[in-house]
Structures are given as structure tokens and as C-alpha cells.
Amino acid sequence: MSGKLTVITGPMYSGKTTELLSFVEIYKLGKKKVAVFKPKIDSRYHSTMIVSHSGNGVEAHVIERPEEMRKYIEEDTRGVFIDEVQFFNPSLFEVVKDLLDRGIDVFCAGLDLTHKQNPFETTALLLSLADTVIKKKAVCHRCGEYNATLTLKVAGGEEEIDVGGQEKYIAVCRDCYNTLKKRV
């Protein structure tokens, strides 16, 4: 039986990692073997753990290239969990397809859009393959409504790949994005 791909996406501060961690917990409670991964580039909260903004976390294999996952996935692995997929190169798509064909469920969390509203290529590829998409929203940093679907960069230059937290990025709704973008 083929595995299923679930992609959790949305802006920063929308609870993507928290949702991913809840699926890890469900698999562990079900006594299913899991493998958890994060990109080496993301060491904001911890170097070897996936940690949510709320502080919850789980140990993870830290890798640079998606192909490195294969050495950590054992014959009896039932679930693979990957955080911050936007930071991986597009070869993650082929690795995930292989895992699904092997009957392993895969859960991915990551940003869908850059702060310039351009799609992250790796996330877009995974969304095209997904059996289930969970599109998260956040509370808009400016108006306070629970309608934020975009991430706005407020400090640190224009680079689209620039790891950071609240010191660089805020979640905003489209109206507030357009208003604030004129000022930034």
C-alpha cells in the first residue's frame, strides 16, 4: 500500500511546526517508527531539534540535502516528518515520491510563499503531490484579525532565502501586506 503525503503550509507564525509535531506524537502514540528531519540552515531555536515558536520540540536528523534522509529511514519506518521544506532543494520531491512508493507516510511543513509572494519551488512541488493539504492562517500582526496568509519581511534586506524569526518577519493579511509594503 502506498504512503500518503500531507503538506502543512501557510505564513510564518501560523502553527505549521506545531501541527507537524502533533502528527509525530500521534505516530509515536501508535507505536509507529518515525524519522524526523530538519534542514541544517535552520538553527533558530535548536541545532538538533524541531522546535515550534511555542517551545515544543522533538529530536531531528539535521541534513543539508534531501538524499541524506535515506540513510536514516529503516525498513520498519512508518512515518517521515520534514520541517521547513522550503529550505531544501527540489530533489526533495523525488525522495518523497520514493518514500510514498515504499508505503511510508510523509508529513511536510513549510512556507508556501516568500516575503515577495513568490512560491517556494520545493513547497510548490510537494503541494502538487500531496494527498492532503493543510493551509494554515495566522493572526495579522497589524490588524489583529485571524486572516494572515502572507509573510512580510520587516528587516534584513531583500533576500528571499534568509532564515529569521520575529526580528525579521511578521504574518499579515493581504490588505495589511499591501499597506505595509508601501512603507518598507
Curated annotation (Swiss-Prot):
It holds the Pfam family TK. Coiled coil: none annotated. Its EC number is 2.7.1.21. It catalyses: thymidine + ATP = dTMP + ADP + H(+). Keywords: ATP-binding, Cytoplasm, DNA synthesis, Kinase, Metal-binding, Nucleotide-binding, Transferase, Zinc. HAMAP family: Thymidine_kinase (MF_00124). This is Thymidine kinase. It comes from Thermotoga maritima (strain ATCC 43589 / DSM 3109 / JCM 10099 / NBRC 100826 / MSB8). The gene is tdk.
